[in-house]
Regions:
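Surface-exposed loop/turn segments and immediately adjacent short secondary-structure elements
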Residues: 20-26, 47, 65-70, 75-78, ...
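Short, conserved micro-motifs composed of acidic
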Residues: 223, 419-420, 479, 494-530
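Active-site palm subdomain of RNA-directed nucleic acid polymerases
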Residues: 322-338, 361-362, 440-467
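Conserved polymerase palm-domain catalytic core
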Residues: 376-459, 468
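Short, charged alpha-helical motifs in flexible N/C-terminal segments and linkers
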Residues: 92-195, 226-271, 276-283, 289, ...
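Surface polyanion/phosphate-binding segment centered on an Asp-His-Pro turn
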Residues: 1-91, 169-172, 182, 186-187, ...
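Conserved catalytic palm subdomain of right-hand nucleotidyl-transferase polymerases, strongest
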Residues: 242-251, 300-310, 349-393
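Active-site-proximal segment of RNA-dependent polymerases
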Residues: 204-235, 279, 285-288, 327-374, ...
Length: 704
């Protein structure tokens, strides 16, 4: 162990003390390898010219989809590699982009004066460092970043995040990972992770290829509504987001977008051939898996990493058309309690429905409410393709959509990338790739027949169930859990008992906890907790929003410093306000219709105080009301009220999924005419204040 006294940082008067163990090793400066093509205007013109004069007629005459794909990619790669070969660059970044040699020299001189004890010289140099830093930061923003907001907003936002230090990717989060409690060597990490991801589906039978071939051979002529127009493909290509990651085929979106006019016809032919024949080319069934840590740093490969599959952009375009056809058929069949990846439904709607049921039940103090939050283990990775195929047939999906969807999953391949390392490519026997459009849709089909007699909601794989009874040992929730276990065994799904939790809500006479029968799944008791985060919002056993408000306030407290950094860097106030709205206000307002009605005055003031503090940093000379006027912002309380009213207006529409929660006032049999301004909805008179915390009760009581 050694210690080192360093000069104060910035304008601080306090000296720094640096402590380190002798055995500590300094991590090397991060490096990353970037593979890219030089796609300037001249290169794009040359590529477009050669593609335009290629013999695509030969490709259009081919009946086999895989042969068409092979021809397309061979011609495309040959032309692109001729004019824009792939280049590799290794980048090293351990300094802020605005730092200059002069600035470093001043810092070294300041530190030398500090060590020598020359106080007057140190003060002079310290002031020079602080002044120069401020000038450099402001000049860097005005010269290199500010103009990007209009020309390239993505680069502007990336630069802003770099200034703040937001989401800095640090590969050290993948160090010291374990698999089955054994450490994994860094040099072998991608292969170990890929092998584990593939092994999750062990024991599940691969798709019965002969059955799929039989369905494919019996396909009728493709209906006209499933034939994609050349313009539709052109439009999809022209709308590609150039900032999105390049797929495993190494074809950049910038290339596809700029060549949309010349590529529309051959890509259209390839997609239509794929839909007609029910064959997805092998180039579209290969994924690069990127790992997203669920916590930082990640420790356990089994539970701390979320695999996201990056697929080729052309495959995504084909999926967008299939997604549309899927929705047209399944929207009328989807479970009314499924809110995930479904048109006109959201997490807020799911939470409103679930919380309304709980608040209504709690209005009767004798009721004992038990809420079960179910967590599926590797839900997407455990999808049995044979079970999925049968369910697609049972729901009478169009033949071409069924066969195409299953062909997309059959014999998929993936490799894992960690930093600049790629694993070997392995084949998958089960599951749906996360990050694709088809993944959530396929899981919705899998879980659509999972229904309960109790109140429940589903958001893709997040499932929550609540039982209400005057008997604290009511077995209805245990019966539901047993039914869930049977369903899982039948559908090759697994429940993560360790992450499945229960909350008990009761406001009547106290009940001896030792007399309460715990919920049991496969011989393991489900843990009872006082609070749980459901779809981003914390629920607790007291049915207050204390835990959730504390959670969002703690989360944004870490981000207020970013506002200070931007102001000090010289970023324009309007731009800082935009950043505030994106990274702070969005957190303070997430799902606000669910919890706004239950806020205390103090909690509302605490939330408003965050906006006051940020605006005080941006406009220190203005009062809060003056800052609101200058920025055009509304007070957060007003915004939450507007969100409540807007959400309720949508729910009042007869076709809204939550419209059934509204009760119309009974009409007078003697006078069926309703007075013009009479409010049409009513709610039972509340016995306690808890019912008034419900979104529905609040809106009706306030005559929204």
């Amino acid at each position: 162990m050694f210690q080192l006294f360093c000069p104060p940082l910035g304008r601080s008067d306090h000296s720094c003390v640096y402590l380190a163990q002798d055995l500590c090793r300094r991590l090397p400066v991060g490096r990353k390898t970037i593979r890219h093509r030089n796609l300037n205007e001249q290169v794009l013109d040359d590529i477009a010219y050669d593609l335009l004069h290629s013999n695509w007629t030969y490709m259009y005459m081919l009946d086999d989809c895989q042969t068409q794909a092979d021809y397309f990619y061979s011609v495309f790669y040959a032309i692109v590699n001729k004019h824009a070969p792939i280049e590799e660059r290794t980048l090293k970044n351990n300094d802020k982009p605005w730092i200059t040699v002069r600035f470093i020299e001043l810092i070294e001189a300041r530190n030398a004066a500090f060590k020598a004890g020359d106080r007057s010289n140190y003060n002079r140099l310290r002031n020079q460092v602080n002044r120069l830093r401020s000038v450099l930061q402001k000049n860097y923003y005005s010269r290199h970043i500010e103009h990007l907001k209009k020309g390239d907003s993505h680069k502007w936002w990336t630069s802003i995040k770099n200034i703040c230090g937001i989401e800095c990717k640090d590969q050290s989060v993948f160090e010291n990972l374990t698999l089955h409690d054994s450490p994994v060597a860094t040099n072998n990490l991608p292969d170990v992770i890929n092998s584990f991801l593939v092994s999750v589906g062990e024991g599940i039978q691969p798709l019965n290829s002969s059955r799929l071939d039989e369905l494919r051979n019996n396909l009728h002529d493709c209906p006209d509504r499933y034939i994609i127009s050349e313009y539709a493909v052109y439009y999809a290509l022209s709308q590609l987001n150039v900032s999105k990651s390049t797929g495993p085929d190494l074809i950049e979106n910038k290339l596809l977008k700029n060549l949309a006019v010349v590529l529309a016809a051959p890509v259209c032919s390839l997609i239509n051939c794929s839909i007609r024949s029910g064959v997805v080319p092998s180039q579209w069934k290969r994924s690069r898996v990127t790992l997203i840590p669920k916590c930082s740093p990640a420790h356990c490969i089994e539970s701390d990493l979320r695999p996201i599959s990056i697929t080729p952009s052309l495959a995504k375009i084909a999926e967008t058309f299939i997604f549309k056809f899927f929705d047209e058929h399944f929207n009328s069949l989807v479970d009314a309690n499924q809110f995930g990846c479904t048109s006109n439904r959201s997490t807020t709607h799911a939470l409103i429905k679930f919380s309304h049921h709980i608040f209504t039940a709690s209005d009767t103090s004798a009721n004992f409410i038990r809420i079960l939050f179910i967590d599926f283990t590797k839900a997407f990775d455990l999808i049995d393709h044979n079970v999925l195929l049968q369910k697609l047939l049972d729901y009478n999906f169009p033949q071409h959509i069924t066969v195409w969807s299953m062909s997309f999953l059959e014999n998929r391949e993936q490799f894992v990338r960690v930093a600049a390392q790629n694993s070997s490519t392995l084949k998958l026997k089960s599951g749906c790739p996360q990050g694709t459009l088809g993944g959530p849709n396929n899981f919705k089909v899998m879980i659509n027949d999972l229904t309960f007699s109790l109140s429940y909601i589903k958001y893709v794989d997040d499932t929550s169930v609540a039982s209400v009874s005057a008997d604290h040992n009511d077995i209805s929730l245990q019966t539901t859990l047993d039914e869930l276990s049977v369903w899982c065994n039948k559908n090759s799904m697994r429940i993560n008992v360790n992450k499945t939790k229960e909350i008990r809500v009761h406001f009547g006479k106290s009940v001896d906890k030792s007399k309460l029968t715990p919920l049991v799944l496969d011989g393991v008791a489900i843990e009872t907790v006082n609070s749980f985060k459901l779809l981003g919002v914390y629920f607790n056993s007291e049915l207050t929003w204390k835990h959730h408000i504390d959670y969002i306030l703690n989360k944004v407290a870490k981000r207020i410093y970013f506002i200070y950094v931007l102001v000090r860097t010289g970023v324009k106030p309007d731009d800082v306000v935009s950043v505030y709205c994106a990274i702070i206000r969005s957190i303070l307002e997430y799902a606000s219709p669910v919890w706004h009605a239950g806020l205390t005055k103090a909690q509302s003031n605490d939330i408003e105080g965050v906006q006051k503090r940020c605006l005080r940093i941006i406009y220190p000379e203005l009062s809060y009301n003056e800052a609101l006027f200058v920025t055009g912002l509304d007070a957060l309380t007003e915004r939450r009220e507007k969100a409540m009213r807007s959400t309720f207006d949508n729910i009042k529409k007869p076709d809204h999924v939550l419209n059934s929660l509204l009760q119309l006032k009974p009409t007078n049999q003697n006078n069926t005419r309703m007075r013009r301004k009479e409010y049409p909805y009513f709610i039972e008179r509340a016995k306690t204040s808890r019912l008034n915390r419900s979104f529905i009760s609040y809106c009706i009581n306030h005559r929204f």
